[in-house]
Amino acid sequence: MDHTGEQNIQSVKSYEFTPIGYIKEKQNNGASKRPNESPIKESMQDTFRNESPPRKVRRTSIDDAMNSRMFNDSMQFDDTLPELDVNLQSSKLTSINMNKKNLIKELKENSNASNPLKEQQEQLSKLTTENYNLKLKCNSLLKVLNNVTDQGELRKSLEFLDEIEEWKSKYSTANSEFNLLKIKYDDLVIKFRNLESKVDEQESEVEDHTRCIIERDNLQNKIDKLSEELGTLNDKLDTITKELIAKDELIASNEEDIKQLNSHIDTLKNTIRGLEETIIEKDDNLKKQKDEIKTLNNNLNDSDHLGSEFLLLQNKLKEKNSQISVLENNLIDSKNTATELKTRLENLQKEYDDKLREKINQIHKLDDNIKQLKSERDSKYVSLDTNDKVRKDFERMRENNANLDSKLSQISNENKLFRDKISKLSNQLDDTKRERDNQVELMKRRIDEIITNNNRENSIAADKSEEIREKQEAHINELQRKLNDTLKVQTLSISTVEDKFKAEILKTKKELEENAQKLQKSEELVKELKRQVIENTTNASERNSKRLETKDKEINLLKNDIIELKNKINSLEKDSKLEDNNLREYYTNKIRQIEEESLNEKVKLEREIFMLKSERDTLIESNKHDINFWKSKCNSLEKQNEALLSQENEGFSSVNLKLNQRLKELDELLNQNNTLKKDNMELTRKLSKSQILNEEYKVELRKAVADLDMATKEYQKSKDFTKIRGSDDSNFELDNMRKNLLIMKTKYNNIKKDYLTKLSELQEENLQLEKKLSMNQPTSRSSDNAAAVQQDRIDYYRLKYHNEVKSNNDLKVMNEYLNRVLMAGSQQIRLDLLKLKEEMNLNDYNYSNFPNRDYYNSRNPYESAYDFRFVNNSHNIFENRHRKKFKTIALLVKACVRMKNTAIKRRWDEQRINYLQRKIAVDDNRITW
């Protein structure tokens, strides 16, 4: 059609445009008639009136492609992909539809492939994303190989390269640590590598050496298994040693606590010894006082009753001393239990503090990790759609984030429970501390009161003994009895502890002082009486008898007073005994509770210590057993290695030579690596230059496209102008425009070819660089490379498959279109033949009246819509010319856009297929010609 259009430019409008696409069959009931059979319009009458020859006028517009006479069916575009069913086709095309090679009956995955506009939009989006990915890859390669910073717009979207460098640094640190851990087993690995090199040499020397290969593989498998087992055992040993160290630390801390308790017990024992010595001294003093009292009792024959009371008082003193000693022992025990409880509480607090610190540190670490992961996640949101590997990493990071969030929630819940427990325990500890402090203070006060009372009793007893020594005379027995009563009162007042009886004791003391004063007065009177008796024995016997009677009366009165005082003292003693009994019962119950609690805690601690010791013993035994087992394994392996080495000692020299050769080769490879790095630097520079050139070419392409658009517009204008004018000058201008268009097309094609060649060169360089990178990368990324290669193969075969399906669909549609054209052409020829027969038979109409009969008798179905013979006519040129419909123009534009997009997509698909084919070939280390 293009060839015919170039030959006959004026008849271009007569051609109908039928875009390639899927056609839905519809029966056109109102089919258009032949234009020659239509009646003559008013324009023909106007021409007859003007005495001009009549012109044939078409009934319908030639530009109306939808209501074309070429087809009986209406043209429609289907936006969906064709479902290649036989039942959907008409009965006329059954023979065509039967031959469906390389087609699928129902292709529903590529359901949008038949809609050219949607397909082109999707392909454009895919191509833009692929172009963007390729640019990112080129820039990443530049940064990795030459540390070249990108100064363009892609710099914003290359944040993940920094993450790659960080992961590289992390990998290097982890690799260094792993190498340090592997130093212990390097000797065995070197020996096995030597054996492997020997096996390789034997393989190269001997053709059929399958047994050695099998043995080598077995040895390698054994070595790998042993290395894995050794690694796992090392991990187990590390964990066990850590547990042992932790338990030893706990035991050491417990031993330190025990030492502290022992030291505290020693100090308490020393204090007890000092107290016992003081008690012994007091006992000696008491014995001395008792001896003195006995001597006084011997001297005082009349004071038998008072002596028995004094003995009772001494027994009471002994009982109180024994009670004091018991209370002191109880105090010591309570102090010991209090110290033990303190140490235990301190240990528990330390343990809880350590656990809290560990948990807090873990929480801080997790917070830092979460912040890093969130920053990484935010940075990777930008480059999610760029690469499949990044998607997988992002999914993994999402899973890790979900796991970390769940762990954080668990740790937060545990921390809450732990803090609640700590708060409860701290409250319990505070309560127990307060109770313990109150009990200790009460015991201290009680002991201080008892000690003060003892001191008072001792001092009072000493004073009274001195008074008794001074009063050795026989006639002062009654006064000594009074003094003994006062001693009894004072000893009983010692037992009163509380403040209620202090006032009564003070009253008794005042009364005793008054009695003592009375006694002193009576003694003075007795002395005076003695003197008077000595002086007046002879003369004043009667007076003395009277005085003696008066004195006897006074003595009787004093005795009555002493009896009253004794009754008061007895009542006070009863009250004090009751209070003492109550206090004893209270403190004994408290002491029993404390002792029971301390015993329970001791039992618990002993059980824990026993369990820890048993666990330690079991761990030590298991470790010893494991160590012996692995020692035996190591010894067996060493024996096997020694046997293998003894078998192959002869080949060590050759192995050493080959090792030296390999080292030399390694040095050469290092030199080559340095040269390759330099080449990479040059390549990166070339890449940067090529990118700049590509941008320049893009600018030139844009300019060329703009020039082409301008030229096409001018060409269309000139075309319209030439159609109106039809002069030779216009033909000359058209030729010039054609020449200019051809020049522009050649320039455009040359620029396009250069751009495509440079793109292919860049792709090849990219493949080479990826190959070099894959060679330089460690073995840990082999799985990722394998996954990438598999993905490339999947994309390659998918593209091939879709291209085949599309080509088959296009061929099918073209075949249907050509069949329709043939059918329409045959119908047209038949109608023309019938018309010729009718015109040959007609003789009514005379054609001689009309000039230029060749024009009217022409049967060209694609005749021009405009007759240039009427250019110089007086009436308007555009009267009988029909204007183009918007529908036809829109369909033409739509078809052009679709064809352009399909062509671009086809070209990009071919480039993508070639690129993937070369990449797969490079990954497989083979060359496809």
From Swiss-Prot:
Coiled coil: 117-777
Localization per Swiss-Prot or TrEMBL: Nucleus; Cytoplasm, Cytoskeleton, Microtubule organizing center, Spindle pole body
Region (Disordered): 1-66
UniProt keyword list: Coiled coil, Cytoplasm, Cytoskeleton, Nucleus
A Pfam family of this chain: Spc110_C
Ranges annotated as biased composition (Basic and acidic residues): 34-54
The organism's place on the tree of life at top rank: Eukaryota
Bias type Polar residues, positions: 1-13
One GO CC annotation: spindle pole body
InterPro entries hit by this protein: Spc110_C (IPR040593)
Job description of the protein: Component of the spindle pole body (SPB) required for the proper execution of spindle pole body (SPB) duplication. Potential role in cross-linking filaments or anchoring other molecules. It is essential for growth.
Stated family: Belongs to the SPC110 family.
Subunit structure: Homodimer.
Protein's UniProt name: Spindle pole body component 110
Organism listed in the record: Vanderwaltozyma polyspora (strain ATCC 22028 / DSM 70294 / BCRC 21397 / CBS 2163 / NBRC 10782 / NRRL Y-8283 / UCD 57-17) (Kluyveromyces polysporus)
Lineage: Eukaryota, Fungi, Dikarya, Ascomycota, Saccharomycotina
